[in-house]
Amino acid sequence: EPGTSAGAAYFRPDSEAIVARLPGWQVWSVDRRENALEDHSVLDGYIAGKRTQQQVFDYYLGWLTDPKISPHFTAPTDLSVDFTRQWGMDVAIGDLHQVVGQAKKLGGKVVLGGHSLGGAIATAYATWDFNGKSGSDDLDGLVLIDGASGPGSPITASDANARVQKLATSSPFLDLVGLGLPWSAGVFTALGSTAALSSPDAASLAYNWKLFPAMLKPPVEPTNKAQFGYALDTKTGPASLELVQMHIGELAPSGAPRGWKDDGITPVQRAAVAFAGIEGVDGTAWYHPQKLSLDSSAVNGGIANPADAVLDVHATHGKDLHIPIYAFATSLGNQRVLDAATALAKQSGLASSGLTLVDRASTYAHCDPIAAAPDKNDFLKTVEPFLHNIAS
């Protein structure tokens, strides 16, 4: 299950590594229903080599400063997708229940994992009440990658009511970059990552575009690969984008346009693969429902609380988790993720042997686990034995 503003493709690097190392396993990645609102028409053409870098840039971004560009991307208006204000945890869990059901039909073990907000969604699923039955009854394990939900201080019912009322008059979608264009973060990342793969050494078109955020711009004109790496690296990316940061590298010492030098645990190419797309799918969510993030504040490790009724959250089987739990913490989730996993295990009476905790808060950024090189990736090195034990 992807995290905030994330799409199915960003599990691609780890998925390929896992199925190569663990014969018999499949990795299914969820593209939530909000991803169906995205317009991949020209981006798909670029990936297929049928559109140029300039054409794809103009279609999605260039038209904002050049009214002569037509046809161009048009985002749905808030009014036209007003129904998305209801796309919260209940909707996401209902959709995920269908996916888990299909996986169970194969007859093997089913392990549910999630990164970031996806970890909270995975926790919600495992503790969800499906007509008196716990969601964990469908599962053989739980993998929480720098995201989870533990019991403690859920949102109050009054605060939940206030947030719901505010959402009714604001955009249904998260504006991660703050440009008043909720889709822009997804488009920037999808285009930047795809250009880093398709035209890595060409000059970045975004760099000289007048609306490109200054916080993302290197001090010199970069290649596509360098622009992408610079924007997402922990040393140079803005703090506001900590959700997508990795230890990638740095600008090359020379060159015009300036290239990129890998010197971190995550090569820039693997980082780009995580966010670039295949046909119709990329590693971002251009339209992340604010209701989904709001609802996560009431999951509370599956312990019922007054906000549940306000937000239509049904995670109430927090003491019925009798499946192995794995948790991996980076600098963003930090001790909170490990504490949440520990609390989940404790409240269900899970034996210590059923809990695997991996603390890399001092060395891993939030997205390093999903894209770090396999030979350096401590997530892969520790989750693979966890999965092997479940299968045996």
Predicted segments — roles?
Residues 303-320, 326, 349-392:
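Catalytic active-site module of serine/aspartate enzymes centered on a nucleophile-bearing elbow/loop
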Residues 113-122:
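Gly/Ala-rich beta-loop-alpha elbow adjacent to hydrolase catalytic centers
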Residues 153-328, 332-336:
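Alpha/beta-hydrolase
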Residues 1-62:
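Short, surface-exposed "cap/lid" segments of acyl-processing enzymes
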Residues 132-154:
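A conserved short beta-strand
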Residues 46-104:
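Alpha/beta-hydrolase active-site loop
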Residues 328-357:
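Conserved loop-alpha-helix segment in the C-terminal half of the alpha/beta-hydrolase fold
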Residues 36-40, 148-159:
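A short beta-to-alpha transition loop/helix N-cap that caps and shapes the active-site region
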